[in-house]
């Protein structure tokens, strides 16, 4: 097995509001890794929360906490960038993009 193989996707670990990428790209996946406090995760095509809302992951119930390790597939073209915003959410996600 060759450890130097490139798979083409970048992974960014997110635990707060952040610009994941600036510029044109593809939003591939969002993986919910862990939840400390339930809330919402918003994904925008842009560099801040004024961009176009692409997705809202609602993790507001006790049942949602059991989603840890769940991956949401988008494969969505982003013209401006990827911005992630947490509302009442404390936890950890991974955004995969190219």
Predicted regions and their residues:
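Surface-exposed, low-hydrophobicity beta-strand/loop segments enriched in small/polar/acidic residues
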Residues: 1-98
């Amino acid at each position: 097995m060759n450890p130097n193989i490139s798979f083409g996707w970048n992974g960014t670990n997110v635990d707060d509001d952040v610009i994941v990428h600036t510029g044109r790209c593809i939003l591939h996946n969002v993986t919910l890794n862990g939840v400390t406090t339930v809330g919402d995760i918003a994904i925008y095509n842009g560099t801040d929360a004024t961009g176009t809302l692409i997705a809202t992951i609602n993790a507001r119930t006790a049942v949602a906490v059991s989603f840890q390790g769940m991956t949401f597939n988008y494969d969505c073209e982003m013209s401006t960038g990827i911005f992630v915003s947490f509302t009442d959410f404390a936890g950890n996600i991974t955004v995969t993009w190219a």
